[in-house]
């Protein structure tokens, strides 16, 4: 069952779901709560690698990823990050999210931004039960013009569903949880996948 605005408010008030900093109640709409853009970004550097072999030896995949991904870029308050057409970038939500083992979250982009060509999450919009940390956004500009993205702007909305029971393996206790407690735009850790 997806939570309605009344339940989202109650779950936040009771500490069942946590968003830090907590958005004002006027950011809770029907069945979602707005989340804002943080100030941490990563982009792909100019590179000459013809491809990344995602199924290659872990050491090679790790080296290839390291060679193409930038260090963390922090955008100061009031300044903009420019996402150019055809470009992929990673960013974070301003809010850190904490979910219990019986609730799953979903991130959706804003229709108004999508109409300008901005994809807020390329494919990864599920927030696992037991998640704790900021949400990394996979931005892609499929439009024709550069887009100026500023920290604190509303970037998407979260919705929540109560599971049929408590997850046996919530994200918070999984030993293979690669992005546990992330607070910045963490690059892909596909090289840490188990065989």
From Swiss-Prot:
According to UniProt, the reaction catalysed is: dCTP + H2O + H(+) = dUTP + NH4(+)
**What is an example of a GO molecular function annotated in this UniProt entry?**
nucleotide binding
Q: What does UniProt list as catalytic? A: 138 (proton donor/acceptor)
| Pathway stated in the Swiss-Prot or TrEMBL entry | Pyrimidine metabolism; dUMP biosynthesis; dUMP from dCTP (dUTP route): step 1/2
Quaternary structure per UniProt? Homotrimer.
Q: What does the function comment of this entry state?
A: Catalyzes the deamination of dCTP to dUTP.
The cross-references to PANTHER family, in alphabetical order and at most eight, read: DCTP DEAMINASE
Q: What is this protein identified as?
A: dCTP deaminase
This chain's source organism reads Haemophilus influenzae (strain PittGG)
Q: Which gene encodes it?
A: dcd
